[in-house]
Every structure is written in C-alpha cells, then in structure tokens.
C-alpha cells in the first residue's frame, strides 16, 4: 500500500498495488498491464493526472491506459485531467465507485474497448458536446465489452455505442440506475442497438 500515487509509474510483473491518498496529489499518466491489480482509494481527495501522457507506441495521448487482463478499482474521490484526447483508455475490468471523474477538455472521458466496467454512484463530467463514456467493440478483442451504470451515478456528457468493422464480440450497456445528461449516440456501425442496451 502506498500513499504516493507515483508508485503507479513503476508497475511491473503481476503487481498487486493499493494506493490510498492522504491529500490532493498530481501524477503523470500511467498504464496497467495484463496480470496487474490496482486499487486506487482517493480517500476524499483529488488526483490530477498530468503530462506526460501514455498509450501505445505512436499514440501516447491517454492520461491512463488500462490494458486487457488487468483489474482496476478507483473509489472515494475525484480524478481530474486537462487531457484533450481520451482521458481513460480502458480495456480491463474496471470499477468506478463513489468517484467524480472530470475531463472537461477531453473528447472522451472514459473510452471502453474491452472488459467489464462498473460505474457505481459515480459522476462523470465531460465538456459540452463531448463523450462521458463509450461502449466500443474494438478491433479483434475477443472478450467483448460490458458497461453497467448503477446507483446514484450522474453522467454529464454523451454516451456512444460503436464497433470496429468485423468485430462480432458481445457488447452490453446495462443501465440499472443513475441520471444521464447528454445524448445517446449510436454509430452507424451498430445495427441493432436494442440488443445492446438494457434499462432496468
């Protein structure tokens, strides 16, 4: 367990790391790899993700990149970034619990291309006309993508459904609670949105 979030910059192997902030902090962009587990407890503080950003070679534009096979939980605080591209690029099993995620300059605050994603009692703030999150069946990822929104979550921004050409893996958007202040944008790549969206 660390109180310094810069520990996230040095993850290796099958790291199993807990971060618990003891004050507001700033950290460079970070990434997680397959087999790694990260629990980020902001403890009612603000973590600002700054430059340099991270990503795949040639596209290092994310404030964090969470790769397939990793497990990440963020809870109890505010995650912020001035990123003007994609703030959180997610391919992993991700839980956002009692969070505020602020990416007012980002095109996408949270882009989900793979994995199981739970947004619980969490506020996501996007800028005007931008995307709070998406559900994207991306490329050749074979695990599909499932996003569940529940509790008192507030989604300020658009939500997009899309998929890559040839991707036939399962996609789900399960809305079990929350307030949505934005448009649902269904890309032309989605031919049957009613098979993806479940409102209960």
Q: Model-predicted segments: where are they?
A:
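Exposed beta-strand and adjacent loop surfaces of beta-rich binding modules
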Residues: 16, 37, 158
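Extracellular beta-strand-rich solenoid/capping regions of secreted or surface-exposed proteins
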Residues: 26-39, 49-75, 80-94, 105-114, ...
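All-beta strand scaffolds that present successive hydrophobic residues in beta-strands
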Residues: 40-42, 72-76, 94-98, 116-121, ...
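Beta-rich extracellular carbohydrate-active architectures
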Residues: 47, 79-83, 100-103, 119, ...
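Extracellular parallel beta-helix/beta-solenoid repeat domains
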Residues: 128, 159, 164-172, 176-179, ...
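Long amphipathic alpha-helical scaffold regions
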Residues: 112-117, 123-133, 139, 183-184
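Acidic Gly/Asp/Thr-rich repetitive segments characteristic of extracellular carbohydrate-active
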Residues: 1-22, 26-29
């Amino acid at each position: 367990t660390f109180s310094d979030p810069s520990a996230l910059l040095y993850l290796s192997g099958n790291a199993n790391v807990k971060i618990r902030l003891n004050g507001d902090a700033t950290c460079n962009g970070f990434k997680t790899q397959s087999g790694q587990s990260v629990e980020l407890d902001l403890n009612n503080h603000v973590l600002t993700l700054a430059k340099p950003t991270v990503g795949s070679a040639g596209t290092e534009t994310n404030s964090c990149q969470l790769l397939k096979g990793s497990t990440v939980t963020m809870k109890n605080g505010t995650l912020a970034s001035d990123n003007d591209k994609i703030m959180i690029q997610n391919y992993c099993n991700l839980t956002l619990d009692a969070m505020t995620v602020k990416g007012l300059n980002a095109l996408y605050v949270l882009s989900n291309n793979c994995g199981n994603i739970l947004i619980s009692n969490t506020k996501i703030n996007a800028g005007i006309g931008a995307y709070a999150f998406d559900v994207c069946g991306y490329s050749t990822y074979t695990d599909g993508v499932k996003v569940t929104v529940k509790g008192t979550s507030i989604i300020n921004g658009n939500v997009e459904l899309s998929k890559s050409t040839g991707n036939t893996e399962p996609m789900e958007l399960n809305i079990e609670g929350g307030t949505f202040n934005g448009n649902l944008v269904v890309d032309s790549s989605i031919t049957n949105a009613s098979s993806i969206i479940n409102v209960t």
